[in-house]
């Protein structure tokens, strides 16, 4: 997903220009301080030149920090999934705004599917941990896996009698 980067790109370019100007000012003030050190001038002039050079160093560091922040923001305008997978629960459309902390979609890792099944106890005699499992999808496909665990007394949202059971 790509957030329009044009605003962020402009901010990076502006920060680059400010950093370049600060670097130039820093070089000029350092040069002035070095020139004064070689000349016979008052202590006050030397101190002023040293303070001016220190101030230019600080302004340059501040400009570099601002550039780093703008670059980081530009990088974040491109949202990349942490895993290969499938997008589900997509709740966004072209032109929508992204809001920090508000989920707009979910990603199902294509290398790690989990299926929770609800079975009545009378239909469990062959279900054992580690046993192969096969699931027939409504689309006609078949998924294969294995039984990882068995739990008892699981909450079933479709069964009103299970409202007091542990929810998983």
Swiss-Prot record:
Entries under SUPFAM superfamilies matching the protein: HlyD-like secretion proteins
Pfam family, any one: HlyD_D23
General function of this protein: Involved in the resistance (detoxification) of the fungal toxin fusaric acid.
PANTHER family attached to this UniProt entry: P-HYDROXYBENZOIC ACID EFFLUX PUMP SUBUNIT AAEA, P-HYDROXYBENZOIC ACID EFFLUX PUMP SUBUNIT AAEA-RELATED
Name listed for the protein in its UniProt record: Fusaric acid resistance protein FusE
Gene that encodes the chain: fusE
